Every structure is written in structure tokens, then in C-alpha cells.
Curated annotation (Swiss-Prot):
It is a multi-pass membrane protein. The chain crosses the membrane at residues 24-44, 46-66, 71-91, 95-115, 121-141, 209-229, 247-267, 296-316. Keywords: Bacterial flagellum biogenesis, Bacterial flagellum protein export, Cell inner membrane, Cell membrane, Membrane, Protein transport, Transmembrane, Transmembrane helix, Transport. It is found in: Cell inner membrane. Signal peptide: none annotated. Required for formation of the rod structure of the flagellar apparatus. Together with FliI and FliH, may constitute the export apparatus of flagellin. Its main location: membrane. This is Flagellar biosynthesis protein FlhA. The gene is flhA.
Length: 692
């Protein structure tokens, strides 16, 4: 075995289980050998039996897979099985023409059995059965499966952007990690490749059916010529001998072909669920006893018609009635939902204490009673786990751990309603429907879907609540489809990011400082509280978070404060110098991996006018402020159309003023100063404010 590995330039230390990599090349060599070399009848029997067994195995694997990607090798297997059948046809044709004059067993026992036993030794019946099998395979199964594969490939490719956006949404919301996102993206790509391959592989099966008809005609004509001209047989004897052998050969090849075509149809028509095809069919066909009763009634009426086979119809009527009775009895025996136990009221009046004073939670969520299963682990609720992932991801990205989200039910809310509170005040609310999916239109979705129209609570996009059965259709049409718990988690993540500065209190500042002291004890000991008070540090960090600047790089922040705090105590001025020190991180945040940055700029006369207003201390004139706001809004729209970040680049002295003024009306706007941008980036002004 090691010598063989050396000859084939394979690793010498291949394990016995790794020699399966040679299965493909060996199979191709065997198929080519069958086409070229004459085979004895016994070997042909073995190969025909192997072909039948292989087709049955492929069909059963297709039936028991729960997702199409579990049988991603099916298009390749389809090609190999088609080649195997054609090679068997060539080998059997050779032996039929060479030895057909010797008798019915010339091509082996399998061909003889299919030619005599299955069709009673009558070649006319055999031809009819063979043609019917070919028509079923070619006109019905193969044509339908090919069309489904073609449409499925197109729809899967059209739905790829929506699926990718859903993966990105889960990743951004902290619901999945980077590894899981890569795995899901890979599965989306594999699914597209699979359906594209199935679109082409279905042509193999159709070609195989056509080849079967042509091979049968050629075998019959060739057999007649060989029998009459070479072996001196009579026309009738030659026709009977060679036609029966040809029919047996055709049937033993077409029956596995029909089985493989059925497997192809099962693969492309199945819906991906956690059940295999058999479970889906049984559960959906026999789930409703009313259907059984109506079917029994129809069969019973037919059974009472004179001249009909009454016994057969009435027998099936009784069977359906019994099945309906059994299904209904099983439904009635299903355990009912436990009723909530009402607690006995305690009329004893207890003196109020300070423990009765309820402090407001920094962050909370209230849910209606229909959403309780989403936050209950015992009912497989996923929301608590998603919230933990959100807090962890937020801490890794922004640099501090947000408060714990306290969740409680609120019977005053609508059943499917939830609301998110910060310090007791509602900052967001929405509806969620467990068991249904939110199809979000990113602006490129095609067509409409039946369902309840709504708006995505996090980003304000048009959306529709749809049933689970429409999920794949929505993805194909370009919608981003997410489940109910993901909707709530994404909304919460968005609000936490928006209110990061308010969630970062003095307690969080002290906890962060204690964490930094574990890594940099000398720096924190020298700085706080001797040079910078905790109040000033807290305010600087809050200012950074207010403009979406992460505070992960605490070393740079503290060292910058240690340098400038002795000569400047104003938190806003200190924030400005810290931002300059964090310039590389800020640039990377908004322009990752780009040498050329596309930003909005200020017209020079307008910049000069704003600097004069800033130095004079009189503020902006109302007319100038209105024009500045309107032109900034127009420039932001152009940035969005170009796919560029919403960044306005201004003079360092103007940045605090413009940031405070513009972000009141345009919270998505990011105002950067020229000193905060990395020197190695090329600046390109995509829009200029002023000059009008």
C-alpha cells in the first residue's frame, strides 16, 4: 500500500480510512474498463445488482436527509450513477450481440430474469413496459425535477443577499460569533452551488432516458442483423431472442434510473426542516382527523354505487374512519397546559420599611404575556441568552460592560408588546410574535408577502410579520428574515448603542478604573485622583461614548489626560485632545482598510464665517443655522447613495460646536476634525456644505 501511495504521489502515512480519496478515480477507471473490455456474464450480474443496490441507497439517503446540504454530493453521485448505467448498457450490448444466439442466459441471470420473469417472456409486453417506464422517467419525474432545480437555483441565487444580510444582522447584534457567521456564510454559498449543480445534473438524467430508448432500438436492429446474417437464425427466432435480451437489459437499467430520478425529485422538492421527508409527509397528511372523515365519506359513497367493487371501497372507508378516531383520541389525550395557581391573599398588613423603596433599574424590559416563553429557559426561550451575548459583544467593542437588563412581565401591555426602559423611562417599544418571522425589506426586495405589515423597530425599515411556511419564499424574494427573539435583541442592542453615554455612570467609571488598575497600577495610581478627579474622567469618557467613540484604549486615554490635565481641567477641552490621541482608532472605526476616505467638507468662506462666529461668542445666526442644517441633510443623502460613512470633516476648532448643533437633528452624523484623521489617508470630498 505504501508503494502504491509513492507511485501515485500520495502521502505515505495515509490511514486506512483515508484511502477513500481514491474511490472516485477507481470508479472512473472501472467505468471506462466496462466500456472497453468484454465482461463475463457473472461479472455483469454483479454490476447490475450493484447498480440496483446503489440506486436504492441513494433514494433512502435522499428520503432521510433533513437539509439539502446533508447530501451535497448528490449532483456528483448523479453523474457517476448515470455513467455507470451507460457503461453497463455498453457492456451488456456487447455480450448480447456476441453471445445472444446461444440462449436467454447469454447476458447473465439478471438480464434473463428481467426479460422473462418480469414480462412473462413476451417481448411485446416487454417493449410496452419499457416504453412506459421511459416515459414516466423522462416526461414526468425528470422534467419536473429539472424545472424545480432550475427555478430553485435562480431563487436561491436571488435570495443570497437577503440571507447574507440576516447573518450580518445577527453578527452585529451579538447573537452569533465570527466563527458561526463564517459557517453560515459558507452554508449559503454551498446551497447556491448545490442548486446550481442540480440544475445541470438534471440534464444527465434526461439524457440517460433518451439514451435508453436509442440503445434499445440499436440493440434490436443490431441483434436482428447479427442473428440472421452471422448466425443463420430465422427472422422470428432472432427477433424473439435478441428482443427479449434487449428488453431485459433495458429494464434492468431503467428501473435504477427511475429510482435515481425519484431521489433527485425528492432532493429538489423537499423543504428544509428538522424532519426527514417521511416524517413531514406523515405528520402533514395525517394530522387532521377531519380530512380522514371526509375522505372516508367520499369512499363510502363510491362503495355504495352499484357495479363498483364495494368490498374494497368499504374496507378503505372503515380504515380511514378508524384512523380518524385514533388521531382524534390522541389529540384529546394530549396534556393540557397547567393553569396558573392562584396564590392565597394575605390580609396581614406589614409595616412599611426602607426595603419597600424600589430603585429604578438602569436598564429594563417589560413584556406582554405572549412573550413570556421567549424569556423562560424552561420553555426554550432564547432571548436571555441573546441578551447576554449582546452585553458581551458591546463590552468588547465599546470598552465597558453595560448594566444588566432586568426583565419582568407587565399584564397592562398588549399580549405581544414589549418595551425597553432606561432608569424607568421608556426609550423604545415594539411588537413580537413568537413562532412567526419578521421579513425586513432592505429596499431591494421583490414582490409582496401575505402577513401583518409593520416597521422594523431598530432601523425603521418596512417589514412584514409572516408565517414560518413563507420564510424561504421571503428569502428568495430578497427579504432579510429574522425570528421574533432576534427582532427584540437587535432592537435592544441598537438602543444600548444609542444611549451608551447615559448608561455609563460613575459606578461604571469606577469599575472600569478598577479593571484598568489591574493591568496598569502605576498609571492609575498617579493619575486618579491626584491629577484627574473621577468626576472629570467620567465626563471625558461619557463625551467619547456620546459620539460613538469606543473607550477600549484606556492606556492612550489615561496617558493623554496625564499629559494635559495639569494645564487644562475643562472636560470638553480634555475630550478634544483625547480624540486627537485616538485618531488612528477613530479613522479605523469609520474607514476600515481604506486608503481613500470619502467625507463631507465645509466650503472655505463658510468655515471662515463659522470661525468668526465662534471667536465672537455670539453663536450662529438663525438663517445661517437653517441653511447649514438643510445643506448637511442633502450631503448626508448623497453620502448614503454612494455607500460612504456619514462623516463630516471640519476644522479642529469648529468640531465641538458643529457636533453639538448638527447631531441634535441628525443623530447619525459623525463630525471629525482634521487632526483626528490619520495622516496616511487620502481625503476625497464627496460633498461640500456652503457656497449657496
Amino acid at each position: 500500500m505504501s508503494n502504491l501511495a509513492a507511485m501515485l504521489r500520495l502521502p505515505a502515512n495515509l490511514k486506512s480510512t483515508q484511502w477513500q480519496i481514491l474511490a472516485g478515480p477507481i470508479l472512473i477507471l472501472l467505468i471506462l474498463s466496462m466500456m472497453v473490455l468484454p465482461l463475463p456474464a457473472f461479472i455483469l450480474d454483479l454490476l447490475f445488482t450493484f447498480n440496483i443496490a446503489l440506486s436504492i441507497m441513494v433514494l433512502l439517503v435522499a428520503m432521510f436527509t433533513q437539509r439539502t446540504l446533508e447530501f451535497a454530493a448528490f449532483p456528483t453521485i448523479l453523474l457517476f450513477t448515470t455513467l455507470l448505467r451507460l457503461a453497463l448498457n455498453v457492456a451488456s450490448t456487447r455480450i448480447i450481440l456476441m453471445e445472444g444466439h446461444t440462449g436467454a442466459a447469454a447476458a447473465g441471470k439478471v438480464v434473463e430474469a428481467f426479460g422473462h420473469f418480469l414480462v412473462g417472456g413476451n417481448f411485446a409486453i416487454g417493449i410496452v413496459v419499457f416504453v412506459i417506464l421511459v416515459i414516466i422517467n423522462f416526461m414526468v419525474i425528470t422534467k419536473g425535477a429539472g424545472r424545480i432545480a432550475e427555478v430553485g437555483a435562480r431563487f436561491v441565487l436571488d435570495g443570497m443577499p437577503g440571507k447574507q444580510m440576516a447573518i450580518d444582522a445577527d453578527l452585529n447584534a451579538g447573537l452569533i460569533g465570527e466563527d458561526e457567521a463564517k459557517k453560515r456564510r459558507s452554508e449559503v454559498t454551498q446551497e447556491a452551488d448545490f442548486y446550481g449543480s442540480m440544475d445541470g445534473a438534471s440534464k444527465f438524467v434526461r439524457g440517460d432516458a433518451i439514451a435508453g430508448i436509442l440503445i434499445m432500438v440499436i440493440n434490436i436492429v443490431g441483434g436482428l442483423l447479427v442473428g440472421v446474417l452471422q448466425h443463420g437464425m430465422s427472422m422470428g427466432h432472432a427477433a424473439e431472442s435478441y428482443t427479449l435480451l434487449t428488453i431485459g437489459d433495458g429494464l434492468v437499467a431503467q428501473i435504477p434510473a427511475l429510482v435515481i430520478s425519484t431521489a433527485a425529485g425528492v432532493i429538489v422538492t423537499r423543504v428544509s426542516t428538522d424532519q426527514d421527508v417521511g416524517e413531514q409527509m406523515v405528520n402533514q397528511l395525517f394530522s387532521n382527523p377531519s380530512v380522514m372523515l371526509l375522505s372516508a365519506a367520499v369512499l363510502g359513497l363510491l362503495g355504495l354505487v352499484p357495479g363498483m367493487p364495494n368490498l374494497v371501497f368499504l374496507l378503505f372507508t372503515a380504515g380511514l374512519l378508524g384512523l380518524a378516531w385514533w388521531i382524534r383520541g390522541r389529540e384529546q389525550k394530549a396534556p393540557a397546559e397547567p393553569k396558573p395557581v392562584k396564590m392565597a391573599e394575605n390580609n396581614t398588613v406589614v409595616e412599611a420599611t426602607w426595603n419597600d423603596v424600589q430603585l429604578e433599574d438602569s436598564l429594563g424590559m417589560e413584556v406582554g404575556y405572549r412573550l413570556i416563553p421567549m424569556v423562560d429557559f424552561q420553555q426554550d426561550g432564547e432571548l436571555l441568552g441573546r441578551i447576554r451575548s449582546i452585553r458581551k459583544k458591546f463590552a468588547q467593542e465599546m470598552g465597558f460592560l453595560p448594566p444588566v437588563v432586568h426583565i419582568r412581565d407587565n399584564m397592562d401591555l398588549q399580549p405581544a408588546r414589549y418595551r425597553i426602559l432606561m432608569k424607568g423611562v421608556e426609550i423604545g417599544s415594539g411588537d413580537a410574535y413568537p413562532g412567526r418571522w419578521l421579513a425586513i425589506n432592505p429596499g431591494t426586495a421583490a414582490g409582496t408577502l401575505p402577513g401583518e405589515a409593520t416597521v422594523d423597530p431598530a432601523f425603521g425599515l418596512n417589514a412584514i410579520w409572516i408565517e414560518s411556511a413563507l420564510k424561504e419564499q421571503a428569502q428568495i424574494q430578497g427579504y432579510t428574515v429574522v425570528e421574533a427573539s432576534t427582532v427584540v435583541a437587535t432592537h435592544l442592542n441598537h438602543l444600548i448603542s444609542q444611549h451608551a453615554a447615559e448608561l455609563f455612570g460613575r459606578q461604571e467609571a469606577q469599575q472600569l478604573l478598577d479593571r484598568v488598575a489591574q493591568e496598569m497600577p502605576k498609571l492609575t495610581e498617579d493619575l486618579v485622583p491626584g491629577v484627574v478627579t473621577l468626576t472629570t474622567l467620567h465626563k471625558v469618557l461619557q463625551n467619547l461614548l456620546d459620539e460613538k467613540v469606543p473607550i477600549r484604549d484606556m492606556r492612550t486615554i489615561l496617558e493623554t489626560l496625564a499629559e494635559h490635565a495639569p494645564i487644562q481641567s475643562d472636560p470638553h477641552e480634555l475630550t478634544a485632545v483625547v480624540r486627537v490621541a485616538l485618531g488612528r482608532a477613530i479613522t479605523q472605526q469609520w474607514f476600515p482598510g481604506k486608503d481613500e476616505v470619502h467625507v463631507i467638507g465645509l466650503d472655505t468662506p463658510l468655515e471662515r464665517l463659522l470661525l468668526q462666529a465662534l471667536q465672537g461668542g455670539g453663536g450662529l445666526e438663525p438663517g445661517l443655522a437653517d441653511r447649514l442644517l438643510a445643506q448637511t441633510q442633502e450631503a448626508l443623502s448623497r453620502q448614503e447613495m454612494l455607500g460612504a460613512p456619514p462623516v463630516l470633516l471640519v476644522n479642529h476648532a469648529l468640531r465641538p460646536l458643529l457636533s453639538r448643533f448638527l447631531r441634535r437633528s441628525l443623530p447619525q452624523l459623525v463630525v471629525l476634525s482634521n487632526l483626528e484623521l490619520s495622516d496616511n489617508r487620502h481625503i476625497r470630498m464627496t460633498a461640500t456644505i456652503g457656497g449657496k
